[in-house]
Regions:
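Short, hydrophobic/proline-enriched secondary-structure or compact coil segments at domain edges
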Residues: 40-43, 90-93, 234-239, 308-319, ...
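Autoprocessing Asn-cyclization modules and mimics
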Residues: 2-180, 187-194, 200-203, 222-252, ...
């Protein structure tokens, strides 16, 4: 089975070349200096990797999946795909800044799973999103065991987790017991096999659908998120993805979403995040000085929720007048504090809890930065990420 059961296996994997080191440098991108407690993305900052040209493109309010090979995504490299033979992990990292007055600050490494571009910022009602299930791969079914086997891997089906909502299509006739235009939920058997359930609860319980024949033609599974596919641990951020600042307004910002238990009609809690007026490029809109409506970088979830499977509505309560923003679905990998100018912050993730964060194939890795004090524009950050797989 992929993964590491001992330190000896980690050492063996590294000796066998099953590792990757990436050096990076990114510039702080906003057109105005940050104030303390603000968070910004480094997506569009110059450096290595270069600035993205993705997050202010595409159709309004439509989900767009992001992978490390997505055109113009400009993500951190992590060694390419290794599944299902191996599992990849982030083993260690360091980061540093030599830019004056930047430290102390905090860097957060995140996997951006996908995003919704919002250009209709003058609309003040909750706007419905489009969530087309665009990830797809083919499968065959065994009527004797009810087990389905992946027969293509273009969209990395080894990433699919138990409880993921899917739909099916076919060029012929689906296996008996299954239908098109119907929601099913995955029971993951292995990285190459799965079963299907009629509900999320049945998927978690392992109660599969009885398949009584293999059907005819080519069968296809479609799903939404390319990683963390059931939404567990997935969070959201609102950020200015454009070079132009947003307009002069301070709207409440809220989401309607489906949670990772596949429960619909979930909502941002009552004390809503408040967007900054004239928010500059790369700003996570509701971060900044303390007070009502100011939060850490993720949007708060409804009580009891553990993640977002899809966003169904997006709302700014008053007109943002001009500009645009994006809402991204992200999974935090780790954080590293930078306490002192010129002194690297280091993380040995083998010995932390939880240790060895998993890096899924296709991961779109980026940095966010949380300012501890006023941060000048074009401030540089640099460092190194170390990955190992086995």
């Amino acid at each position: 089975m992929p993964g590491f059961a001992s330190n000896d296996r980690i050492i063996s994997a590294m000796s066998n070349g099953q590792s990757f080191k990436t050096s990076w440098v990114k510039n702080f991108n906003p057109t105005t200096a940050a104030v303390a407690n603000e968070w910004h993305t480094l997506f569009r900052g110059g450096g290595n990797p270069p600035a993205d040209a993705l997050y202010n493109t595409g159709t309004n309010l439509t989900f767009q999946a992001v992978k490390d090979n997505t055109t113009n995504a400009a993500t951190m490299q992590h060694g390419g795909n290794v599944q299902p033979t191996y599992y990849k992990y982030l083993s260690s990292l360091h980061a540093v800044t030599a830019a004056a007055t930047v430290a102390p600050c905090t860097l957060a490494l995140v996997d951006v799973i996908g995003f919704y571009r919002v250009t209709s910022v003058t609309t003040t009602t909750a706007q419905a999103t489009t969530n087309t299930l665009n990830q797809s791969d083919t499968f065959t079914a065994d009527a004797g065991t009810d087990i389905c086997t992946w027969t293509s891997t273009a969209n990395i089906p080894s990433n699919i987790l138990t409880g993921t909502r899917v739909r099916l299509t076919t060029s012929g006739t689906l296996p008996a017991g299954l239908a098109t235009a119907t929601d099913y939920y995955v029971i993951k058997s292995s990285d190459t096999t799965f079963q299907l359930a009629t509900s999320y609860a049945n998927a978690v319980a392992g109660t599969q659908i009885n398949i009584t024949d293999a059907g005819t033609g080519t069968h296809t599974v479609t799903w939404l998120l390319p990683r963390y596919t059931n939404g567990a641990g997935v969070q959201a951020i609102f950020f200015n993805s454009n070079a132009t600042p947003l307009g002069a307004a301070t709207p409440n910002l809220s989401l309607g979403y489906t949670n990772s238990s596949q429960t619909t009609s979930r909502a941002t809690p009552t004390t809503l995040p408040v967007g900054k007026t004239a928010a500059s490029n790369s700003l996570i809109l509701y971060t900044g000085a303390t007070g009502s409506g100011k939060y850490n970088y993720t949007v708060p979830l409804q009580s009891g929720d553990a993640g977002i499977a899809e966003i169904n509505t997006i709302q700014n309560s008053t007109s943002y007048v001009s500009g645009e923003y994006s809402v991204a679905l992200i999974k935090e990998i780790t954080r590293v504090p930078l306490s002192t100018l010129g002194l690297a912050g280091e993380r040995n993730l083998l010995f932390e809890y939880p240790s060895f964060p998993r890096i899924y194939d296709g991961a779109a890795l980026y940095w966010l930065v949380g300012s501890g004090l006023a941060t000048p524009t074009n401030s540089a950050f640099s460092g190194e990420l170390n990955f190992v797989w086995g």
